[in-house]
Amino acid sequence: MAKQAHITMQGGGKVVIDLFDQDAPNTVANFEKLANSGFYNGLTFHRVIPGFVAQGGCPNGSGTGGPGYQINCEINPNKHERGTLAMAHAGRNTGGSQFYICYAPQPHLDGVHTVFGKVVKGMEFVDEFKGRDVMESVQIVEV
């Protein structure tokens, strides 16, 4: 069965993301573990740059925090296109909880960051982000 992430935004709106658990199994497992534990609930998309990315998943709300551990990159053939979900990091193998969704193709990030999903519904809500947009909940479902 395939997995999806459902990000419900405070104030309405749901972003549905197909997860690439065959291409990035450890990254998807980490994201699922954090989501299932409620880690992302109440966190924000702290970095929103139109035409580039919307980044979230920092418990400090500033881009400086994480879950207290790091995970290895799982570079794969998937490209950074509009709607791509990928892990943010401060250097190879330093990802943890922060992720981003691309607003437009970002080929300079291909082969550098782990792509682990793609928005399939609700990209219009991501397009409306202004910064500090709150994730009410993140749930992983099997479809």
Residues of each region from the PLM?
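Cyclophilin-like peptidyl-prolyl cis-trans isomerases
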Residues: 1-143
